[in-house]
């Protein structure tokens, strides 16, 4: 099942469309449940635990039959994966948390493409999101002394013509922080 987070739906709908097109171009059977809403993270972050719990239950009911739940958002995928079970508190099964993945994680670890039908003759910079790095393990965090890896760059290297340049501080916080950037733009 394809989960399009509320902020993607409202602010960046082209990302949802591009995710759908990418997955189907790889021959995957993609379903977009029309009754999806949100993962509940904005409500949980604002302290509305009951509302977040109700949303997580709806999410689980909507996506539990799928083999995978794929989202173009590391933050939302991480929230479903790690926080939905906490919200459930044993009151419902929370079947989706183990099968929810960010689109990069899904492509890199499950689909494992060896080529992409894409040509992009441009220089791109890759900034790794905090949730992607530290919760989902999409790349190695710079503050830890571990072997370097980057699943995003591994996938981008499959695109013909692309040149990848990482910024000097490639995984330092960008300030977005989900709703924090909307509610506190000057601090963010």
Predicted features along the sequence, with ranges:
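Iron-sulfur cluster-binding electron-transfer modules in prokaryotic oxidoreductases
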Residues: 1-188
């Amino acid at each position: 099942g394809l989960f399009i987070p509320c902020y993607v739906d409202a602010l960046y709908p082209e990302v949802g469309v591009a995710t759908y097109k990418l997955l189907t171009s790889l021959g995957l059977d993609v379903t977009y449940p029309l009754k999806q809403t949100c993962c509940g993270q904005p409500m949980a972050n604002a302290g509305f635990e009951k509302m977040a719990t109700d949303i997580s239950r709806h999410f689980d009911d909507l996506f539990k039959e799928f083999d995978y739940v794929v989202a173009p958002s590391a933050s939302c995928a991480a929230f479903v994966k790690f926080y939905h079970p906490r919200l459930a508190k044993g009151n419902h099964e929370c079947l989706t948390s183990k099968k929810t993945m960010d689109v990069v994680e899904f492509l890199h670890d499950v689909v494992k493409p060896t080529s992409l039908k894409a040509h992009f003759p441009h220089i791109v910079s890759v900034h790794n999101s905090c949730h992607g790095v530290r919760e989902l393990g999409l790349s190695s965090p710079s503050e830890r002394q571990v072997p370097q890896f980057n699943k995003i760059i591994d996938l981008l290297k499959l695109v013909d013509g692309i040149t990848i340049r990482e910024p000097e501080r490639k995984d330092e916080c960008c300030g977005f922080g989900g709703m924090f950037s909307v509610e506190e733009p000057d601090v963010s």
